[in-house]
Amino acid sequence: MRRDLRGRKVRTIAVFATVGALLLAGCSGDDGDKADPTTTSTTVGSSTPPTTGSSAEKLHILVSNDDGYAADGIDALVQGLGDLDNVDVVVVAPRDQQSGQGGRTTLGPLAVTDVTTKSGYPAKAVAGFPADSVRVALDELKVEADVVITGINAGQNLGPILDVSGTVGAARAAVARGIPALAVSQGSGAPEYQYEVAVPAVLDWVRDHREQLLDGTLDPVVTNLNVPSCAKGQMRGLAEVPTDPDGDATASIGSQDCASTVAFSPEMGEVEAFVNGYATINEVPAEPKTPADVYPAGGATTSTSAG
């Protein structure tokens, strides 16, 4: 069965062997550059679902994000997932940049457009919030999914900012429908977002949980993975730590010191571990603390991530 991270300070620290080499590579491209749609917009009701595999052994992965279908992070994720054996990857993501939207959803029909990611992978672009994209994919397009992976987000999502994250909000929309989800974010603060460092961590997680995902024994929870971007040094390891909703808000959005000499300890919180160069992984609540925490004045069209 799955490892229960709730209520635990630390379960393990594991260093990815490939990180050193990967840090030598850089990411290129601007998330603001949109790929050209290949067809005109349609409404949800008339969209054709993306083709999914039929093999019982094939793992079906739905990918979404909050930075939009043309972002570098989602493209790096999709390319990385292609290295896995016997998987079917479907991309349904927001048409536009939707960071900081939490679990907001839209009432009524939404336009869905056939597009491609930056590298040319087929995708569906939804004219709505991140949680809308997952809702549309699962409820309207009837995409088959054993797991939903959201990201790779441009910027960490941890500590007190967790509940405003569209990356987490989209993952919560999957969990509300009984599907396990992995929310993945790459830290900010280095000259470039090092998405290539997060990809191996995602692939390791999928490989570790593949059989449980296929046989339906992995609990439908949101697993939140944050990977540092290192201006100097290398990612120092992977820390399984509880969420830290009362952590330092300023530090939670700051840079990461991968050259830090601060030793890891079981007393470290999520934010402290991350800013000292550790990737962090934990389970987050399926719902935000209160709607007001996610939807400040001005509000959302709905009050939960379920849609």
Where are these regions (language model features)?
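Bacterial N-terminal signal peptides that target proteins for export
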Residues: R2-A14
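C-terminal motif of bacterial Sec signal peptides marking the signal peptidase cleavage site
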Residues: L23-G26
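Short, low-complexity, disordered segments immediately C-terminal to signal peptides
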Residues: S28-T52
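N-terminal low-complexity, Pro/Thr/Ser-rich intrinsically disordered segments
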Residues: T43-L62, T302-S303, G307
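A cross-family phosphate/adenosyl-ligand binding-site feature
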Residues: E57, Q79-S133, E144
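Active-site-proximal beta-strand/loop segments in catalytic clefts of secreted hydrolases
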Residues: S64-D67, V92-Q97, A127-F129, G151-A154, ...
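Charged helix-capping and loop-helix junction motifs
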Residues: D163-G169
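Electrostatically charged, flexible surface regions
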Residues: E196-G307
